[in-house]
Amino acid sequence: MVRDTRNVDLERGLELCKPEKVNKQNLFTNIVKPQKDKINIKTDKIKFFLNNLFTEFSKFHDSCYPDGRISTRSKLRWPLLIIWCILIVFAIDKNFEVKDFLSIWINESFINENRFYSEIWGPIAIYICLFILLLLGLIYCSKIVVKAIPLISIVIAAVVVIIAVAMVKILYICHWLIYKILILAFGIKVKPLGDTLPTHNGETGSHSKATVGSDIEQIEFQNMPTPVKK
């Protein structure tokens, strides 16, 4: 009996595609791991870039300002900002190859016929544009921060006032509730303090103005002589 071999490859492929036949280790090695490695490489590159950037700026800053302070009235603040921008531009180009990418794009798009001039002026134009954009961005951000400082202080003061008023109100409400609970639940009556009068046995007691007359009458009644029975 002759076996039909036309569908052998199809059957074998379907057999290999079954879930129990899939090799998870090969799937991870061939698909997941390369993508994960690419992400890790990009992350390490960004970390390395930031580390180099702040290291270079720290060296420059420490050499210009040993005490660690930058005065806003110093005449060197603008040169410092310009040098800071130049360091950022070169650090970005060193780690992410911005110049090479833009140079290729400029050469292929605009000036293929003048390659000599494009190789000279292309990178210079790219650096100048990046520098200007970065400088304008830093200046704009500094203006926003300066304008936001008074607003932030006003907001903080308003929040503090609101918290203080709320605390006073809460204390007043708690005092009122405790007073009402003592009166209603336990029947405690708070009497106002009045004058002190001597009692019949020589002791002093606290009396209010409303009970002064009745106490005097009671004392006189107790001191009256008792009648003698005949």
Curated annotation (Swiss-Prot):
Keywords associated with the record: Membrane, Transmembrane, Transmembrane helix, Vacuole
Q: Name one GO cellular component term.
A: fungal-type vacuole
- For this protein, the parts annotated as crossing the membrane are 78-98, 120-140, 148-168
Q: Where does this protein reside within or beyond the cell?
A: Vacuole; Membrane
Chief location of this protein within or outside the cell: other
Query: What membrane topology does this protein have?
Result: Multi-pass membrane protein
Q: Which Pfam families match?
A: DUF999
**Signal peptide region:** none
Name the family.
Answer: Belongs to the UPF0494 family.
Q: What is this protein called?
A: UPF0494 membrane protein C1348.07
Origin species: Schizosaccharomyces pombe (strain 972 / ATCC 24843) (Fission yeast)
